[in-house]
C-alpha cells in the first residue's frame, strides 16, 4: 500500500514538474528573443527569396529585349544595304538581259554539271 502511494506521489510530482517547465518555457526572455529573431530571419529569407525570384524572372525578358533590339538594328542595316543596291542599279547602265536558259540544258563546270 505504501508503494502504491509512493508511486502516485512520484507520478503527480513528475506531472507537476512537466507542466511547470512547459508553462515557464515561453517566459524565458532569451528563448523569446531567439524565437523572434528566427521568425524575423525567416521572413527576411522569404523576402530575399522573392527578390531573387523576381530578378531571375526579369533576366530572360531583358535578354529578349536586347536580342530584339539587335535584330532591329541588323534589319535596319539590311534594309539600308538593299536600298543602296537598288539606287546603284537604277543609276547605273541598263542591266544586261539575263541569259535565257534552255530547259534541260546542262553545262560542265568545275567537275559538275550545271543547268543553263
Curated annotation (Swiss-Prot):
Please report the name of this protein according to its UniProt entry.
Somatostatin
Question: Which BP terms does GO give this entry?
Answer: regulation of cell migration
Q: Which UniProt keywords apply?
A: Cleavage on pair of basic residues, Disulfide bond, Hormone, Secreted, Signal
Q: What is this protein for, i.e. what is its function?
A: Somatostatin inhibits the release of somatotropin.
Disulphide linkage map:
105-116
Region Disordered, as annotated, extends over 60-82
- Keyword Signal attached: yes
Q: Which InterPro entries does the annotation name?
A: Somatostatin, Somatostatin/Cortistatin_C
Signal peptide as annotated in the record: 1-24
Subcellular location(s) of the protein: Secreted
**One MF annotation (Gene Ontology) recorded for this entry:** hormone activity
Give the family from UniProt: Belongs to the somatostatin family.
Q: Which organism is it from?
A: Gallus gallus
Propeptide at which positions?
Answer: 25-88
Gene Ontology cellular component annotations, sorted alphabetically: extracellular space
**From start to end residue, where is composition biased (Basic and acidic residues)?**
72-82
Amino acid at each position: 500500500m505504501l508503494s502504491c502511494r509512493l508511486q502516485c506521489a512520484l507520478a503527480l510530482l513528475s506531472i507537476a514538474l512537466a507542466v511547470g517547465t512547459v508553462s515557464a518555457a515561453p517566459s524565458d526572455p532569451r528563448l523569446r528573443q531567439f524565437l523572434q529573431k528566427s521568425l524575423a530571419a525567416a521572413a527576411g529569407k522569404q523576402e530575399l527569396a522573392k527578390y531573387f525570384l523576381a530578378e531571375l524572372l526579369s533576366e530572360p525578358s531583358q535578354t529578349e529585349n536586347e536580342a530584339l533590339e539587335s535584330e532591329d538594328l541588323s534589319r535596319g542595316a539590311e534594309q539600308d544595304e538593299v536600298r543602296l543596291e537598288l539606287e546603284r542599279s537604277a543609276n547605273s547602265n541598263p542591266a544586261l538581259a539575263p541569259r535565257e536558259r534552255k530547259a534541260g540544258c546542262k553545262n560542265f563546270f568545275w567537275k559538275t554539271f550545271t543547268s543553263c
